[in-house]
């Protein structure tokens, strides 16, 4: 059996350290709008000198360690989102639907366009999924796993 476990990257992603992940009770809604996002353009559009809201990774790691999903969700920040959401308003629209359906927090993943929301109730995530499916095809409700993700097949 092969597993991908909860690892946190540091530096430019080359340093990995194990951290405890979300509890198995956390429901995650993932929505990938049918958009192309150029990672290169997003990074070129990022003004490092004028980033107003940066993630406090040490604090977020402490939230994970303590299992405080509410505090984690309300403090999630993605600095790249300011750039991508200016190019594609759908990012904020998707987050709004998730938050209106009681997501504890929602944000874009990486340079986008995928958006995820953390929920403590599956019925809320399913309600948001139903709304999002009216406009987007790739919408998924999943649960976190304490053991990691099982990968069927071999790593190459």
Please name every model-derived segment.
Residues 113-115:
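Conserved glycine-rich beta-strand-loop-beta hairpin in the small C-terminal domain of fold type I
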């Amino acid at each position: 059996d092969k597993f991908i476990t909860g690892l946190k990257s540091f530096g430019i992603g080359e340093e990995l350290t194990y951290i405890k992940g979300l509890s198995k009770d956390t429901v995650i809604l993932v929505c990938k709008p049918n958009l192309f996002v150029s990672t290169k353009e997003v990074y070129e559009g990022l003004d490092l000198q004028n980033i107003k809201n940066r993630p406090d990774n040490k604090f977020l790691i402490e939230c994970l360690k303590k299992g405080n999903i509410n505090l984690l969700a309300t403090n999630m920040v993605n600095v790249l989102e300011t750039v991508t959401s200016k190019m594609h308003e759908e990012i904020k629209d998707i987050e709004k639907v998730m938050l209106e359906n009681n997501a504890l927090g929602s944000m874009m993943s990486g340079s986008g366009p995928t958006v995820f929301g953390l929920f403590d109730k599956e019925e809320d995530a399913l309600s948001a999924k139903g709304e999002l499916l009216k406009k987007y095809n790739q919408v998924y409700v999943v649960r976190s796993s304490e053991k990691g993700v099982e990968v069927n097949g071999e790593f190459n």
